Amino acid sequence: MANKLINIETSSRAEVDQKITAMRAGGKILGNLLRDLREYVEPGMTGKQIDAWVRKEIVKRGAGVAYDMLEEEFPGAICISVNDALVHGAPTDEPLEEGDKVSFDLDLYYDGYFTDSAFTMIVGTKANPAVKKMLQVTESSMWEGIEQVKPGAHIGDIGHAVEQVLRKGHLGVIENYIGHGIGKSMHEHPEVPNYGKKGHGYKLVEGDTICIEPMSCLGKPANFVDKDSNWTVRMKDGSIGCHCEHTILVTHDGYEVLTLAD
C-alpha cells in the first residue's frame, strides 16, 4: 500500500507539475474547510452532526470524501477525537461540552490526489490551562518540524525537531502513530515519525509531499483502539491527547504548506 512518492528524480516534470497543481488546489479547499469548521463548532453539537456538516461541505466545495475510499470504510467523513481519544475518532451522538478537547482530522480527494490536515481545539470559552498549553506546544512542535523541510533534509531531522519541542513541554510523545507521504494514495512512503535522529532516514527530494503530524498527551503515551468503534484510539491512562497536521510540499529551496487557509 505504501507507494513511492512522485518526485523529480523518478517522474517527468509534467507529472510532478500535475501533482503539485492538484494538491495545491485540494489543500486550499481543505484548509478553508477546517478554518470554517473551527468557527462552526460549539457546545451541544454532536460528532455526527458535525460530520454531516463536513460531508456536505466537502461535496459543495468540489472535493471527494476520502474516508469513503478506504478498504475498511471509516464511519464518517472526518475523524473527531474527544478528550482521551487521540486519533481516528469515529463520530458519535454524544454532545460536545464546554471545555472539551476535540481533534479534527480530515483527508480530501481532489483531481486524483489526497491532502490531509488536522487541528485540535477546546470547545467553548472555558479552557483547562494544562490542556491549552498542550495544544500550543504540540502546534509549535509541528511548525518546528516543518521548518526542517528542504531538499536533502532527512526524515530524522523532522522527527528530532518535533520530539525536542514536545519533551521540553513535558508532554508524552506518541510513537506508534506517525506522519507519512501522501499523493495518489492517502498514505505513501516515507513514514514520518515524531521522533528520530538528525541525519537519519529518507532524504527529501524536491517535489515530495509529506504529512507532518505530531501527537502528544498529558499522561503516558500508551494507547489502544476502542473496541466499541474499532477505530477510535484512546489513551490507556485516560489522559488528554492532542493532534495537529499539515501537508507539506518540498520546494527547490525549502517547503510550502499546502493545507493553509486563505
Residue ranges and their predicted role:
Residues 1-262:
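Active-site neighborhoods and metal-handling regions in enzymes and metal-associated proteins
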